[in-house]
Amino acid sequence: EKLWTPAEARETLADLFPAVDVLFAAERDARTVLGFDGDAEAMASGLAAEFDFETVVITRGEKGALARHGGTTTEQGTFPADTVDPLGSGDAFASGFLAERLDGASIDEALAYGAATAALKRTIEGDMARVSADEVRAIVEDGGGVDIER
């Protein structure tokens, strides 16, 4: 709302959507900016159907994320972490997800790597996730059984 109204944002974004394969949206933005109601699964399904996205990922903060891909919805919880600064966690999630998908991972695996990258980011001051692939992999392989501390 600082730069434009939700209606203006939706109109501008809708013009760009034909070039989008993978859409990431925070649950609140899918509701307020894109105008989709219901739970995250309904939003993801609706967005995928209306705009013909290959994949829609809805992030839900502490409730994790879900992805709609190929007519299937997959959910991922969060990994526990001592939060120092949440700023940039959504971007970190997207980067972890995309890195894995580009490397040939399944949607399930990509969601886990996105969640692990976001968890690691929350342990870092500032808005940039300065983490390694090995750190992310260790969180995923551990299954989130250990609180992440730095």
Model region roles, listed by residue range:
Residues 1-46, 63-64:
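Conserved beta-alpha-beta core of the PfkB/ribokinase-like small-molecule kinase fold
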Residues 36-150:
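Conserved phosphate-binding/catalytic region of the ribokinase-like
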